[in-house]
Design a protein with these regions (language model features):
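Extended, low-polarity transmembrane helix blocks
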Residues: 1-38, 56-64, 68-71, 75-147
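Membrane-interface interhelical connector segments
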Residues: 36-54
Length: 147
């Protein structure tokens, strides 16, 4: 295993990290699936409404990223890279939807609407910082004799 790969997969997180990892992963996995199930409300239609460029390309792309990276978080495989991809996703979501709301409706309305996004943001920062935890595929890969 290369030193970079070992560093990406190594974790010193407590066992309870699995709770954060699975919940954050599940939220993104379900959001990604919903972009395909309800395209007008949550996919292409929503992306068009909020002014995301090329919504017919970006909505499916974001949906796939959320499904794949969310699934990776759930099982604890490539946790840090998956969390980075989702961190970019949630940062764009906050900037494109919550910042305009802050300007239009004020602080408290924006905070109310951003509560889940902010929880996911900090959950992702936590996972990037500490890794997947001992109950993960990442930890099993590193623990292998040739890992």
């Amino acid at each position: 295993m290369t030193p970079l790969l070992r560093k990406l997969l190594t974790t010193e997180a407590p066992p309870a990290t699995v709770l954060i990892r699975v919940v954050v992963g599940w939220v993104f996995l379900s959001e990604g699936i919903q972009k395909f199930l309800y395209p007008e409300a949550l996919g292409v239609g929503r992306f068009s409404k909020i002014g995301i460029p090329a919504p017919h390309v970006m909505a499916p792309f974001v949906g796939v990223v959320e499904v794949v990276a969310g699934g990776l978080l759930i099982v604890g495989l490539a946790t840090r890279p998956a969390a980075v991809a989702l961190l970019i996703d949630i940062a764009v979501a906050l900037l494109s939807t919550k910042v305009p709301m802050l300007e239009q409706r004020g602080f408290w309305a924006a905070m109310h609407e951003a509560r889940t996004d902010l929880a996911m943001l900090f959950g992702l920062i936590f996972l990037i910082s500490v890794g997947a935890g001992p109950r993960s595929i990442d930890a099993r890969i590193v623990a292998r004799p040739n890992g």
